[in-house]
Amino acid sequence: MPFGSVGAMLSQMEKETSIEKVIILKGAGGRGKTPTLHLLIDLLISKWATRIHDDGYTSDIHQDCFVILDLPGFGNVGIITYGDRGCEADVQKALNECLGRGCRAVVGASHMQYYKNPPTVYKILWDFGSTHNAKTVETTTIIKADGWGQSINETSLNTICAENLFNLLLKL
């Protein structure tokens, strides 16, 4: 096989495994970002995704984690629940792992601020999408307003949000 063909083949492989989508689930602390992303992980696993990288995933939906799932027919998806201040290095490490594992999409939690100094999780995620020319979307959880909607189950709202994130992954 001529060298040019190998180069073209490697270029095509890189193109097929480049980051295409970055979804930022943003919001203030205690708004359900981590539980929603745990529900998204469970939803993807129910769609036959397999975990190929696991850093801290447990059945505790309030426990931060980072996983990479291989979703049949789609490819690898990185899901990062670290979004609080002080987690910037963990988020950057997770993004590097996503690149190394050929993720097509990344979904990450973040507080809402986009400050340049120091770089926030939001800025790190946003800049990551921009650097890789990915389709980048920010969204929020569905928030139950205080004082009304007492009968609304927050798990139901988080499940609806997780289903919306799943649709964004597939249709964005």
Placement of each model-derived feature along the sequence:
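A short acidic (Asp/Glu
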Residues: M13, P35-L37, A89-V91, K116-K123
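Post-Walker A helix-loop "phosphate-sensing" segment adjacent to the P-loop in P-loop NTPases
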Residues: D42-D55
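Pre-Walker A-like glycine/lysine-rich segment at the N-terminus of P-loop NTPase domains
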Residues: M13-K21
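Conserved nucleotide-sensing/catalytic segment adjacent to the nucleotide-binding pocket
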Residues: I52-H111
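Glycine-rich phosphate-binding P-loop
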Residues: V22-L44
